[in-house]
From Swiss-Prot:
InterPro entries: Anth_synth/Amidotransfase, Class_I_gatase-like, GATASE, TrpG/PapA_dom. NCBIfam families: trpG_papA. This is Anthranilate synthase component 2. Heterotetramer consisting of two non-identical subunits: a beta subunit (TrpG) and a large alpha subunit (TrpE). The active site is at C91 (nucleophile), H181 (for gatase activity), E183 (for gatase activity).
């Protein structure tokens, strides 16, 4: 079961930023099964100040069909609130984190649409306690390259042309990104990744 929320709440409140993607509610379902209370906001239907009023325990930025800078408030939200709230970005959300800290998002060397890849990792962050590699489903045509100094790559896929970044964490903030889809039923460790995010001991 997920840890209790802040400020005496019995349930952990998770703001889910929906980038207009069909996978969002699979993530919402997983969060609910893990004992959290997901609250879904569309990426262009809120103001940043409303995040402070909600005061969530965690923020999850969903996958989506566009680029990070077309994803509503996803990038500005990371830039403003990464020091204050734990954030997990999934697929487009991962790219938004990369862009927010100065990384470059470019067309991926291989188009991935429902393909399963072995994901290698170093066991840190949301990958704590997972086998390496583990199979995960990928749906993406973009990838983060030239990862900024603030982010540490902790997961990758071995491609014909080299490694593709599949995950990173911030050096100082509780901010994590995964390029693959943990909510896919073919991603064996998906729910454990979300559980690790919810149970991160970071407190503000």
């Amino acid at each position: 079961m997920a840890a209790n929320g802040a400020k005496g709440r019995k349930v952990m409140r998770v703001l889910v930023v929906d980038n207009y993607d069909s996978f969002t509610y699979n993530l919402v379902q997983y969060l609910g099964e893990l004992g959290a209370e997901p609250i879904v906001w569309r990426n262009d239907r809120f103001r940043l100040e409303e995040v402070e009023a909600l005061d969530p325990d965690r923020i999850l930025i969903s996958p989506g069909p566009c680029t990070p800078f077309e994803a509503g408030l996803s990038v500005p939200l990371v830039q403003r609130y990464a020091p204050r709230y734990p954030i997990l970005g999934v697929c487009l959300g991962h790219q938004a984190i990369g862009a927010a800290f100065g990384g470059k998002v470019v067309p991926a060397p291989v188009l991935m649409h429902g393909k399963v890849s072995p994901i290698h990792h170093d066991g840190t962050g949301v990958f704590r306690g997972l086998d390496s590699p583990f199979p995960a489903t990928r749906y993406h045509s973009l990838a983060v390259v030239e990862v900024p100094e603030a982010l540490v790559v902790n997961a990758w896929a071995e491609e014909a042309g080299g490694r593709t970044v599949m995950g990173f964490r911030h050096r100082d903030y509780p901010t994590h990104g995964v390029q693959f889809h943990p909510e896919s039923y073919l991603t064996e460790a998906g729910k454990l990744i979300l559980k690790n995010f919810l149970e991160d001991p970071w407190t503000r």
